Amino acid sequence: AALLVALLFVANAAAFRTTITTMEIDEDIDNPRRRGEGCREQIQRQQNLNHCQYYLRQQSRSGGYDEDNQRQHFRQCCQQLSQMDEQCQCEGLRQVVRRQQQQQGLRGEEMEEMVQSARDLPNECGISSQRCEIRRSWF
């Protein structure tokens, strides 16, 4: 009789098994880290870091630029970088420097100034403590 009661108890418990389903609601759908977007897509989404390009171009020139305009490009560059994964920030900045070198034919001291500024941009923006690895020999 005790065996029959135990079997009934087990059968009854099995009949009332509960299934719990959890769902994660992704409210941050615009965040590239959540979408698993690659660097190329992130860079394109940020207009190829056009504000970083303007800012770095002004940084590499001695004088002859509007300081308010430069600050605005710096802020917008930081905004663009903040929307990207850390490793993509550096890749994007390498592309900016490469593009500037090709378009403007930068050499010597101007090129060195641009490379130095680009290396430190994520840190200067306060979005990363990293220093991007950008070598002049790559260009």
Swiss-Prot record:
What is a GO molecular function of this protein?
A: nutrient reservoir activity
Q: Which domain of life is it from?
A: Eukaryota
Annotated consequence of substituting G108A: Loss of IgE-binding by the immunodominant epitope
Biotechnological exploitation: The recombinant protein could be used for a reliable component-resolved diagnosis of walnut allergy as it has the same properties and virtually identical IgE-binding reactivity as the native protein even that it is unprocessed and hence lacking the proteolytic cleavages of the mature protein. A rapid, highly specific and relatively sensitive indirect competitive enzyme-linked immunosorbent assay (ELISA) for detection and quantification of walnut protein component in processed foods has been developed using polyclonal antibodies against this protein.
Per the UniProt entry, the effect of Q104A is: IgE-binding is retained by the immunodominant epitope
* UniProt region (Minimally required for IgE-binding by the immunodominant epitope), positions on chain: 107-110
What happens on changing E112A? Answer: IgE-binding is retained by the immunodominant epitope
Q: What is one term from the GO cellular component aspect held by the record?
A: extraorganismal space
Q: What is the effect of changing E110A?
A: Loss of IgE-binding by the immunodominant epitope
What are the alphabetically sorted keywords of the record? Allergen, Disulfide bond, Seed storage protein, Signal, Storage protein
User: What's the effect of swapping E109A?
Assistant: Loss of IgE-binding by the immunodominant epitope
Cystine crosslinks: C39-C88, C52-C77, C78-C125, C90-C132
Question: According to its UniProt record, in which tissues is this protein expressed?
Answer: Expressed in seed (at protein level). Expressed in the peel of mature seed.
The biological processes this protein is annotated with in GO are: seed maturation
Where is the signal peptide, in residue numbers? Answer: 1-15
The record's note on activity versus temperature states: Resistant to heat. Retains its alpha-helical fold after heating at 90 degrees Celsius and subsequent cooling to 20 degrees Celsius.
Residues excised as propeptide = 16-31, 58-71, 136-139
The site (Necessary for maximum IgE-binding by the immunodominant epitope) lies at E113
PANTHER family according to UniProt: 2S SEED STORAGE PROTEIN 1-RELATED
Q: How does this chain assemble?
A: The mature protein consists of a small chain and a large chain linked by disulfide bonds.
Role of this protein: Seed storage protein.
This chain belongs to the protein called 2S seed storage albumin protein
Question: Which taxonomic lineage does the organism of this UniProt entry have?
Answer: Eukaryota, Viridiplantae, Streptophyta, Embryophyta, Tracheophyta
